[in-house]
Swiss-Prot record:
Gene: MPI
Lineage per the UniProt record: Eukaryota, Metazoa, Chordata, Craniata, Vertebrata
Domain of life of the organism encoding this protein: Eukaryota
Locations listed in the record: Cytoplasm
PANTHER family named among the record's database cross-references: MANNOSE-6-PHOSPHATE ISOMERASE
Annotated protein name in UniProt: Mannose-6-phosphate isomerase
Active site positions, chain numbering: R295
Disease annotated for this entry: Congenital disorder of glycosylation 1B: A form of congenital disorder of glycosylation, a multisystem disorder caused by a defect in glycoprotein biosynthesis and characterized by under-glycosylated serum glycoproteins. Congenital disorders of glycosylation result in a wide variety of clinical features, such as defects in the nervous system development, psychomotor retardation, dysmorphic features, hypotonia, coagulation disorders, and immunodeficiency.
KW Cell inner membrane (keyword) present: no
N-acetylalanine PTM positions: A2
GO terms for MF: mannose-6-phosphate isomerase activity; zinc ion binding
Length: 423
């Protein structure tokens, strides 16, 4: 009998403090559905499910026919399972980390360097930048998902400068006036002026930031108590961020960055040098294998202000333009493909109606990881006929060039996400 190249995985759960608590977390619910022995602690956060080979969360193999305990060990000894191009391009490593995130309190405002800058930062300060790789990311909403992403159109920033004097005070009159004057100029002039404004904010003295933030919080609180709607300056969000991160400079970032609320199935792609933050909700995420993060606020951690201000992409765009749209497969009516402009990963979303009795997962020249978000199936392959039961929360590794047949065991819709590398 051929050695199995398709097998279920037990994946690592990260209990970071910002995660949703207990069974409020989609991560916890997926875990409980897939593992009847899982004990969900209602007083603990379940922030991330990691599906991949990262050293801090290497997936365990749930197949007693396989001697290797973890996915990274198995891939090291079965290099052809990656796919020929993937193996050669990424030095025999799985190039992506696949995740589910359940966010209760905001993650830090951050950006990730491109490869060239990552190599430089890693050499200069490995304690802050642990590897030399870039870290593009994509998030696809499972529930309504709120985040900050990329610089707003300049017209919107100028409006906030008028409406929020505390914001203008930190930017400074000269930089703010210059931004207003360059609104109709070419993109290079706009980017330069935007960089100047953002740098003024980030380089403000902590004492001054705290003073201005306290003034703004007091003003919003008083106006709200008087029954006035403060949503034109994101009053409720500002108060929430200040409560969670009092005195943090990142509270003012909401006036610079687009605020997105993704509906389930909508996505945002975070390329190198784009400032972003996840605020609340559940999502599927995929990224290149890297831990390099340059933080900008909403964090007690190290903020490298000079690197941050120098590296960011100061190209304004609307929140609508920040949405990343999938393409529908020509071969499979149930398949949507989220294929970002980086080689490291692609995400496929499959929605199969419950009226279908069997669905075939097509073979790819890439290793892939499949996550069952909804539905119950029996999986089988042409090479190894041993059936694999999969239900909500189940995770399956699929070696390159392997197809998988999924037999629906009940008339309920399937929702499946699959991470792969399409070179």
């Amino acid at each position: 009998m051929a050695a199995p190249r398709v097998f279920p995985l037990s994946c690592a759960v990260q209990q970071y403090a910002w995660g949703k608590m207990g069974s409020n977390s989609e991560v916890a619910r997926l875990l409980a559905s897939s593992d009847p022995l899982a004990q969900i602690a209602e007083d603990k956060p379940y922030a991330e499910l990691w599906m991949g080979t990262h050293p801090r969360g290497d997936a365990k193999i749930l197949d007693n026919r396989i001697s290797q305990k973890t996915l990274s060990q198995w891939i090291a000894e079965n290099q052809d399972s990656l796919g020929s191009k993937v193996k050669d391009t990424f030095n025999g490593n799985l190039p992506f980390l696949f995740k589910v995130l359940s966010v209760e309190t905001p993650l830090s405002i951050q950006a990730h360097p491109n490869k060239e800058l990552a190599e430089k930062l890693h050499l200069q300060a490995p304690q802050h930048y642990p590897d030399a790789n870039h870290k593009p990311e994509m998030a696809i909403a499972l529930t309504p998902f709120q985040g900050l992403c990329g610089f707003r159109p300049v017209e919107e920033i100028v409006t906030f400068l008028k409406k929020v004097p505390e914001f203008q005070f930190l930017i400074g009159d000269e930089a703010a006036t210059h931004l207003k004057q360059t609104m109709s100029h070419d993109s290079q002039a706009v980017a330069s002026s935007l960089q100047s404004c953002f740098s003024h904010l980030m380089k403000s003295e902590k004492k001054v930031v705290v003073e201005q933030l306290n003034l703004l919080v007091k003003r919003i609180s008083q106006q709200a108590a008087a029954g006035n709607n403060m949503e034109d300056i994101f009053g409720e969000l500002l108060l929430q961020l200040h409560q969670q991160y009092p005195g943090d400079i990142g509270c003012f970032a909401i006036y610079f960055l687009n605020l997105l609320t993704l509906k389930p199935g909508e996505a945002m792609f975070l390329e190198a040098n784009v400032p972003h933050a996840y605020l609340k909700g559940d999502c599927v995420e995929c990224m290149a294998c890297s831990d390099n993060t340059v933080r900008a606020g909403l964090t007690p951690k190290f903020i490298d202000v000079p690197t941050l201000c120098e590296m960011l992409s100061y190209t304004p765009s609307s929140s609508k333009d920040r949405l990343f749209l999938p393409t529908r497969s020509q071969e499979d009516p149930y398949l949507s493909i989220y294929d970002p402009p980086v080689p490291d990963f692609t995400i496929m979303k499959t929605e199969v109606p419950g009226s279908v009795t069997e669905y075939k997962v097509l073979a790819l020249d890439s290793a892939s990881i499949l996550l069952m978000v909804q539905g119950t199936v029996i999986a089988s392959t042409p090479t190894t006929q041993t059936p694999i039961p999969l239900q909500r929360g189940g995770v399956l590794f699929i070696g390159a060039n392997e197809s998988v047949s999924l037999k629906l065991t009940e008339p309920k819709d399937l929702l499946i996400f699959r991470a792969c590398c399409l070179l």
